[in-house]
């Protein structure tokens, strides 16, 4: 099957497909042409949770996460804008946030400059494991689903058995930021087709890459570590 115009232009760039690559998220996104991605999975290394909790002992209790490069809110907002640019019409952004981002409305600020992205769903990940917390202990993270205009579900979201509260044990040995593998693969299969391009600018342990390999999707992504 011949490459589409977007895929052909992508082949001319210095970007690795379907394999890990060491690259800053901003640089990676800037190299991707407009309107070629069906899905962008974005798991930023934000500090909202750590800053709210302020235990003062990050380096001893969460040393692996503590060592990860941190992203400012401005960088996250810019990368959401870049996601909007590279997404094709009706493509999706899957943005991971924590409860403090949801409670403070920070998740809306991340999308404030991306006027073509509409929030269409929210999935709670129940990690089945008690975490930190000065009050209620953290057992969840949230996956914000935004869709680029025009928004529609019929024919675009094909798996209607995904619950909005997803129970799946975390796998910290894989990567300190590892996200639920089964949910990731289900989501990729739900909103993309075989051969579509899935982008992950903060790939971490490359769980999205693995899900793309299992489902026959093309992966573009990288990380600094």
Residue spans of the language-model regions?
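Conserved SAM/SAH-binding beta-strand->alpha-helix loop
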Residues: 225
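Core catalytic lobe of class I
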Residues: 1-222
């Amino acid at each position: 099957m011949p490459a589409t115009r977007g895929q052909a232009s992508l082949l001319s760039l210095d970007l690795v497909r379907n394999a890990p690559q060491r690259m800053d998220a901003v640089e990676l996104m800037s190299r991707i042409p407009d309107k070629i991605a069906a899905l962008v999975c974005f798991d930023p290394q934000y500090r909202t949770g750590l800053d709210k909790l302020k235990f003062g002992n990050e380096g001893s209790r969460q040393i692996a996460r503590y060592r990860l490069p941190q992203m400012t809110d401005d960088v996250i907002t810019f990368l959401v804008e870049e996601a909007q640019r590279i997404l094709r019409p009706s493509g999706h952004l899957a943005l991971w946030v924590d409860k403090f981002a949801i409670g403070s409305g920070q998740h809306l600020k991340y999308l404030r400059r991306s006027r073509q992205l509409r929030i269409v769903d929210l999935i709670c990940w129940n990690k089945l494991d008690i975490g930190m917390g000065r009050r209620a202990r953290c057992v969840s993270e949230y996956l914000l689903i935004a869709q680029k205009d025009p928004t529609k579900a019929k024919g675009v979201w094909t798996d209607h058995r995904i619950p909005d509260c997803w129970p799946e044990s975390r796998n910290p040995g894989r990567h300190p930021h590892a996200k639920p593998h089964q949910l990731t693969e289900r989501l990729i299969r739900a909103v993309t087709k075989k051969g579509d391009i899935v982008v992950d600018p903060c790939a971490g342990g490359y769980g999205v890459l693995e899900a793309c390999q299992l489902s026959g999707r093309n992966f573009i992504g990288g990380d600094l570590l």
